[in-house]
A protein has these predicted regions:
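Conserved active-site and cofactor/substrate-binding residues in soluble primary-metabolism enzymes
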Residues: 14, 18-21, 33-36, 40-44, ...
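Rossmann-like NAD(P) dinucleotide-binding subdomain of oxidoreductase/dehydrogenase enzymes
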Residues: 95-236
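Conserved C-terminal structural/oligomerization subdomain of aldehyde/semialdehyde dehydrogenase
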Residues: 5-8, 31, 319-419
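C-terminal segments
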Residues: 3-21, 39, 87, 279, ...
Length: 419
């Protein structure tokens, strides 16, 4: 993203410098705020985001044509109310911890100006969340929305900014790039006064953030492996997977991507999927689906499939399915470029693999994990504590979800406390 990208014009640089200067001033003023000041503003912006959860979700659907309205409302609620309940009593100003036995105190200091990339899949909830966290930590943010979701993201920024100002936040604490380009992003990532890059998006965005030479937080693609082990409650697992994988049409990067199923319960599991509205692809259908949905050169899902309904994806691929089909399930026999559906699929398409043993199942889950989801999310359904521990030891993921839906479990606040 920053490599081989031309510099902005002089006029554009003046605009970008103005945004940075404004944010830098706001961040400097913010350092003088007390915990009481911060918490007052946080509560106000949380309530504003919550009040606008539905209209922002509707605006996102209208602009991007991605996802499910009701689920985007829930995302906005999680990003505001759920997050607030988790952080409301946390100290973020001045001395926050003391270690008298070591003669140490921990003092919270803001980092300054944050440059933040916003994805098309979660264009409003991500803004709401980042605004709340910025206020709580006394930082200023320059937002760079996805070009195809600029209107809804910019509206979310406007709502949070105006509310924050009304309740005493410094002027310029939030801003949003207008009609921006890759050149703008590259310029701001390299800017000496930008202290942190917060990139939520695709591989390119995250790679650019980490290649900038600055501190960066990258939230990129997940390729969530799921192990459905023979001792699991199959009915519960299938319901959880369908709920999770169809939530917002599969746009959460923690959603299930490949389910590795023990041989002993494979047939019963697929039967339950069909009972609950899934379509099991034949070998030929799976091949067509993979060829249609995944770009062979990049190994990424084609944009036309992101966040679309299963029946619409089936239509594009030329598959005949029932009109009430919720999920497309494609059997695969390996992981890697020769098995295109083993990659991340931000849509209601799920790969399944039949494993002859626990060792094989765990190996395939590791392969899926390494095929594009390192450090992200993994799920295991089992009553066997030894299997659960082995899974956790082998898989490189920041979140190991046990006997719960991947996407909703990773959001936190519902099935666990991982907010």
């Amino acid at each position: 993203m920053t490599k081989n990208v031309a510099s902005p014009t002089e006029e554009r640089m003046a605009y970008l410098e103005g945004l940075v200067r404004q944010a830098k001033t706001a961040a400097a003023v913010f350092t003088q705020y007390t915990q009481e000041d911060v918490d007052r503003i946080v509560k106000a912006v949380v309530l504003a985001g919550l009040d606008h959860a539905q209209p922002l979700a509707r605006l996102a659907i209208e602009e991007t044509r991605i996802g499910v309205l009701e689920d985007k409302v829930i995302k906005n609620m999680v990003a505001t109310e759920f997050v607030y309940n988790y952080i409301r009593d946390k100290a973020t100003v001045g001395t926050i911890r003391e270690f008298p036995e070591r003669g140490l105190v921990e003092v919270a200091e803001p980092i300054g100006v944050i440059f933040s990339l916003i994805p098309i899949t979660n264009p409003t909830s991500t803004v709401l969340f980042k605004c709340i966290m910025a206020i709580k930590t006394r930082n200023a943010v320059i937002f760079s929305p996805h070009p195809s979701a600029w209107r809804c993201s910019a509206e979310a920024v406007r709502i949070m900014y105006e509310t924050a100002l009304k309740h005493g936040a410094p002027e310029g604490v939030f801003s949003c790039l207008e009609a921006h380009t890759l050149e703008d992003n590259a310029y701001l990532m390299r800017h000496k006064d930008v202290a942190l890059i917060d990139a939520t998006g695709g591989r390119g965005a995250v790679k650019a953030a980490y290649s900038s030479g600055k501190p960066a937080l990258g939230v990129g693609p997940g390729n969530t492996p799921v192990y459905l082990e023979k001792t699991a409650d199959v009915s519960m697992a299938v319901v959880d997977i369908i709920v999770s994988k169809t939530f917002d049409n599969g746009t959460i990067c923690a959603s299930e991507q490949t389910v590795v199923i023990d041989d002993e319960i494979y047939d019963a599991t697929l039967k339950k999927f069909v009972e609950l509205g899934a379509h099991i692809c034949s070998e030929k259908e799976a091949e067509v689906l993979g060829r249609t949905l995944v770009d062979r050169q990049t190994g990424c899902l084609q944009p036309i499939a992101v966040g679309q309904k299963a029946i619409n994806i089936a239509r594009v691929a030329g598959l005949t399915v029932k009109p009430d089909t919720k999920l497309l399930i494609a059997p695969i026999h390996g992981v890697g470029p020769e098995h295109p559906l083993s990659v991340e699929k931000l849509c209601p398409v799920l790969a399944v693999y039949r494993a002859k043993s626990a060792d094989e199942a765990l190996r395939v889950c590791v392969d899926v994990n390494h095929a594009g989801g390192l450090g992200h999310t993994a799920v295991v359904f089992s009553r066997n504590q030894e299997i659960i521990r082995r899974f956790g030891d082998l898989i490189n993921a920041g979140r190991i979800i046990v006997n719960a839906p991947g996407s909703i479990g990773a959001l936190g606040g519902v099935y666990n406390d991982m907010v």
